[in-house]
């Protein structure tokens, strides 16, 4: 069956594959996907038209790729979907430049930059009385000279995930679940040694 829309995905990990699979299972549609690497779960998938673009996270290149897809599927509504924080951010910040047949179902760039930063997100939760785990914001300058008002296990995750993954260190974890104080300190040292410079969010498990 012919449909009047075309999914356009950005990314290359399991999130992209999962979204593409959902579209394929529901509508029989083959999603177009732009990813940075010729590898990963989405690469060479039979349900994805995967296109390698090393500069995929550059704003100008991102807009060019959207424009190409809009022209290729000129008779359809192109659904621009970022599968990952950096691509969600790009879609939100650039959607005003997209061709008329493109839709990016995101909030404004200003709001996404608040929501995507975990430090700002939890501050917003506090402002509106939304419950969340006990949280301390850690700065690199604190070194090992700090304490937490709760015991292990400790959760540690980057406040700015876009800058975090831009470090390009494959040994970094999305979230650290530390079973001891020593493991927490080692994890923090490892993160900053990898080149990340922003804050870390420490939380009660």
Question: Model-derived features: where do they sit?
Answer:
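Generic secondary-structure signature for well-ordered alpha-helical cores
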Residues: 96, 130, 193-197
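A conserved helix-loop-beta module that forms one wall/lid of the active-site cleft
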Residues: 100-175
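Short catalytic-loop micro-motif centered on adjacent basic/acidic residues
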Residues: 8-9, 79-81, 133-136, 201-203
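Phosphate-binding site of ATP-dependent enzymes
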Residues: 178-205
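Hydrophobic anchor at the start of a short beta-strand
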Residues: 29-32, 132-133, 200
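ATP-binding N-terminal substructure of ATP-dependent carboxylate-amine bond-forming enzymes
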Residues: 1-107, 120, 127, 141-146
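Short, well-ordered beta-to-alpha junction loops that form the rim of enzyme active sites
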Residues: 83-85, 159, 204-205
């Amino acid at each position: 069956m012919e449909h009047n829309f075309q999914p356009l995905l950005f990314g290359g990990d399991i999130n992209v594959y999962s979204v593409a699979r959902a579209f394929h299972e529901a509508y029989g549609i083959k999603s177009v996907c732009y990813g940075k690497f010729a590898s990963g779960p989405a690469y060479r998938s039979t349900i994805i038209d995967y296109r390698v673009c090393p500069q995929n996270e550059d704003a100008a290149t991102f807009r060019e790729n959207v424009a190409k897809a809009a022209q290729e599927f000129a008779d359809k509504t192109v659904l621009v979907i970022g599968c990952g924080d950096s691509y969600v951010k790009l879609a939100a910040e650039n959607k005003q430049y997209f061709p008329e047949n493109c839709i990016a179902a995101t909030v404004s760039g200003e709001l996404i930059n608040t929501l995507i930063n975990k430090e700002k997100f939890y501050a917003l939760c506090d402002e509106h009385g939304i419950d969340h785990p006990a949280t301390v914001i850690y700065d690199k300058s604190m070194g090992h000279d700090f304490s937490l008002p709760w015991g292990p296990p400790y959760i540690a995750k980057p406040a700015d995930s876009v800058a975090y993954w831009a470090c390009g260190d494959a040994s970094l974890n999305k979230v650290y679940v530390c079973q001891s104080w020593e493991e927490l300190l080692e994890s923090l040292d490892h993160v900053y040694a990898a080149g990340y410079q922003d804050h870390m969010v420490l939380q009660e498990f």
